[in-house]
From Swiss-Prot:
The gene is PTGS2. S-nitrosylation by NOS2 (iNOS) activates enzyme activity. S-nitrosylation may take place on different Cys residues in addition to Cys-526. One of its GO terms (biological process) is regulation of neuroinflammatory response. The lineage of its organism: Eukaryota, Metazoa, Chordata, Craniata, Vertebrata. This is Prostaglandin G/H synthase 2. The modification S-nitrosocysteine is found at C526. It comes from Equus caballus.
C-alpha cells in the first residue's frame, strides 16, 4: 500500500505542468499571472499593447513605434554631426529641450515605487517597504521551471569558472578606445560604493545601503554612530590629521571606527572614512581624502557666510552641498564622458518640475551587477615614474603618502583604463570576483539577457554571433548555453560587441543609463521644495553646486591644481594597441594568479 501511495504521489507531481509563466509569454512589460496550474493571464494595463500576450500595439503605440528611432540610431546621431550639436549646445532652450527628453525617456523605464525583489516575484507590501532588499527590474525566474532561464536552454548552466576563463579573463590588456583613464575608474568605484553595499551575511539580494542613492554615506558613514565618530563637532567639520603639511583622514585608532585592513597594516596607515572597505586601494583613499577636504572647505565658506550657525547646521548644509556637487559632476563629467555625446549633458532639476516624477529611488540588484566594471583595471598602476602591481597596491596607503595627491591625480589622469565590453579583459586579480558575480546572479535567479533587453525596449539578439560580433566566442557560447535566449546577463554584458570606438556595448548603456539618471534626479535635493538657494546656505552654497566639476573639485583640494579629466588627453594612447579579444592566451601566464583581492564582496 505504501509503495502504491508513493507511486501515486510521483505520478501526480509529474502530472503538474511547469509554471505557465516560465516561458515569459507576456510581452511589452505585460505582467504574467498564473491561473490554476497550467493557465496564465497577461495584464496589459497601461502598456500601450493588448491581446492575449500584450503583443498587439494600440493605434497611438503603433505610431510611436514607427516614428521612434532605435537606440543605436540615437547613439549615432548624438555621437556624430558635431557642428549641429555645437549649435544646440549654444542655445539654452534647445539644450534644455534635448536634456529634458533624455531624462524623461530614460527615467520612465524605471518603475517607481519599486515592484519586486529576490523573494517576491509579484507585487507585495514587503517588496515595497523592506529597504534591506535590492529591488528588481524583472522578477526572478519562477520556481519549478524546466530550465534555469525558464524554458529555453539546457537543464544546467555551464560552470561559472569555465565561463570566466574562456570568455572574461584577460589575455592581454585591451585599452579603452574612448580613452577612459584611472581617475574615472577610481571615481566610479568610490562613487558607487555609497549605494552598492551588499550584505555579506544575508546574501546578494540584501543591501546595507539603506539610503538607496546618493547620500554620501561613503563619506559620512551609513549609521549615525559612525558619522559621529568621524565628525569633529566643531564648525561642522569632519575629523582629519595633518601629514607633510596636508589634510588626510584620521586613523582608526583616533576615531574607533571599524575599517577593513589586514592585521599587518600599521596603525598610522589605517585611515578611517565613511566606507569600511575604502582601505582596499590607494585610489579609493585618494578620493576619500579629496572629499574630506572638500567638506571641510565648504564648512569654512558657510561659516564665513553664516557666523550665527551652529556646528550641526554647518555640517548638515555642507553635506547637502556635497550631494549636489556629486550629482553635477556625475552627470556633466562622468556620464558625459561615458556617453561620447557631442551634446552637452546638463544638471538642471528644474527641467523635471512639470513632469510626473517621483523623488525617491531604490537600488536594483541588476544595476549592482552590471556595474562590475573590473576590465577597467590595468595590470599595473603607474604613479609618477614607479609601477605597482596588485600585490603592492592593495591595502597600501603608504603609496598615497609617499607620492601625495598631486602626483596621484596627475598619474591617474594619464593612465588609460581597459575596455569593458568585447570580452577577455578582466584582470587575473579579479577573476574570483567575476566568478562570484555569475554565481550570485544565478542564486538570485536573474532572467536571461534577452528578457532584460525586452524589458528595456531593445530588440532581442537572434544569435550568439549577433551578440559578440565575431565567430569564435559565439560558437563556444552556443555550445555551452544552447540557445541565445538562455544567455546570462552578466557574462553577456562583458562579451557583447562594443559600440564603435566605445567602452560599452548597447545593452550596458541602455540598461545602466535609466537606473543612473533616475537615481541621480530622484534625489530629494532635486525636488522643487529642496532645489532653492536657502537649502544650501544661500547663493554662495548654490553657486558651489552649480559651478562644480571634476576639475574644480581637484583645484580646490589638491596642491598645485593639477589638470584632470575622465579621459587621457592624448588620443593616440587609446589607439596605441589594437587587440582582438579572440586572440591566444599569450601573456596570461605573466600575471600572478595568487594576488589577493577581498573576496567578501563582488563589488570590489
Amino acid at each position: 500500500m505504501l509503495a502504491r501511495a508513493l507511486l501515486l504521489c510521483v505520478a501526480l507531481a509529474l502530472g503538474h505542468a511547469a509554471n505557465p509563466c516560465c516561458s515569459n509569454p507576456c510581452q511589452n512589460r505585460g505582467v504574467c499571472m498564473s491561473v490554476g496550474f497550467d493557465q496564465y493571464q497577461c495584464d496589459c494595463t497601461r502598456t500601450g499593447f493588448y491581446g492575449e500576450n500584450c503583443s498587439t500595439p494600440e493605434f497611438l503605440t503603433r505610431i510611436k513605434l514607427f516614428l521612434k528611432p532605435t537606440p543605436n540610431t540615437v547613439h549615432y546621431i548624438l555621437t556624430h554631426f558635431k557642428g549641429v550639436w555645437n549649435i544646440v549646445n549654444s542655445f539654452p532652450f534647445l539644450r534644455n529641450a534635448v536634456m529634458k527628453y533624455v531624462l524623461v525617456s530614460r527615467s520612465h523605464l524605471i518603475e517607481s515605487p519599486p515592484t519586486y525583489n529576490a523573494q517576491y516575484g509579484y507585487k507585495s507590501w514587503e517588496s515595497f517597504s523592506n529597504l534591506s532588499y535590492y529591488t528588481r527590474a524583472l522578477p526572478p525566474v519562477a520556481d519549478g521551471c524546466p530550465t534555469p532561464m525558464g524554458v529555453k536552454g539546457k537543464k544546467e548552466l555551464p560552470d561559472s569558472k569555465e565561463i570566466v576563463e574562456k570568455f572574461l579573463l584577460r589575455r592581454k590588456f585591451i585599452p579603452d578606445p574612448q580613452g577612459t583613464n584611472m581617475m574615472f575608474a577610481f571615481f566610479a568605484q568610490h562613487f558607487t560604493h555609497q549605494f552598492f553595499k551588499t550584505d555579506p551575511k544575508r546574501g546578494p539580494a540584501f543591501t546595507k545601503g539603506l539610503g538607496h542613492g546618493v547620500d554620501l554615506s561613503h563619506i559620512y558613514g551609513e549609521t549615525l554612530d559612525r558619522q559621529h565618530k568621524l565628525r569633529l563637532f566643531k564648525d561642522g567639520k569632519m575629523k582629519y590629521q595633518i601629514i607633510n603639511g596636508e589634510v588626510y583622514p584620521p586613523t582608526v585608532k583616533d576615531t574607533q571606527v571599524e575599517m577593513i585592513y589586514p592585521p599587518h597594516i600599521p596603525e598610522h596607515l589605517r585611515f578611517a572614512v565613511g566606507q569600511e572597505v575604502f582601505g582596499l586601494v590607494p585610489g579609493l583613499m585618494m578620493y576619500a581624502t579629496i572629499w574630506l577636504r572638500e567638506h571641510n572647505r565648504v564648512c569654512d565658506v558657510l561659516k564665513q557666510e553664516h557666523p550665527e550657525w551652529d556646528d550641526e547646521r554647518l555640517f548638515q548644509t555642507s553635506r547637502l552641498i556635497l550631494i549636489g556637487e556629486t550629482i553635477k559632476i556625475v552627470i556633466e563629467d562622468y556620464v558625459q564622458h561615458l556617453s561620447g555625446y557631442h551634446f552637452k549633458l546638463k544638471f538642471d532639476p528644474e527641467l523635471l518640475f512639470n513632469q510626473q516624477f517621483q523623488y525617491q529611488n531604490r537600488i536594483a540588484a541588476e544595476f549592482n551587477t552590471l556595474y562590475h566594471w573590473h576590465p577597467l583595471l590595468p595590470d599595473t598602476f603607474q604613479i609618477d615614474d614607479q609601477e605597482y602591481n596588485f600585490q603592492q597596491f592593495l591595502y597600501n596607503n603608504s603609496i598615497l603618502l609617499e607620492h601625495g595627491l598631486t602626483q596621484f591625480v596627475e598619474s591617474f589622469s594619464r593612465q588609460i583604463a581597459g575596455r569593458v565590453a568585447g570580452g577577455r579583459n578582466v584582470p587575473a586579480a579579479a577573476q574570483k570576483i567575476a566568478k562570484a558575480s555569475i554565481d550570485q546572479s544565478r542564486e538570485m535567479k536573474y532572467q536571461s539577457l534577452n528578457e532584460y533587453r525586452k524589458r528595456f525596449r531593445l530588440t532581442p539578439y537572434k544569435s550568439f554571433e549577433e551578440l559578440t560580433g565575431e565567430k569564435e566566442m559565439a560558437a563556444e557560447l552556443e555550445a555551452l548555453y544552447g540557445d541565445i535566449d538562455a544567455m546570462e546577463l552578466y557574462p553577456a554584458l562583458l562579451v557583447e560587441k562594443p559600440r564603435p570606438d566605445a567602452i560599452f556595448g548597447e545593452t550596458m548603456v541602455e540598461l545602466g543609463a535609466p537606473f543612473s539618471l533616475k537615481g541621480l534626479l530622484g534625489n530629494p535635493i532635486c525636488s522643487p521644495d529642496y532645489w532653492k538657494p536657502s537649502t544650501f546656505g544661500g547663493e554662495v552654497g548654490f553657486k558651489i553646486i552649480n559651478t562644480a566639476s571634476i576639475q574644480s573639485l581637484i583645484c580646490n583640494n589638491v596642491k598645485g591644481c593639477p589638470f584632470t579629466a575622465f579621459s587621457v588627453q592624448d588620443p593616440q594612447l587609446s589607439k596605441a594597441v589594437t587587440i582582438n579579444a579572440s586572440a591566444s592566451h599569450s601573456g596570461l601566464d605573466d600575471v600572478n594568479p595568487t594576488v589577493l583581492l577581498k573576496e567578501r564582496s563582488t563589488e570590489l
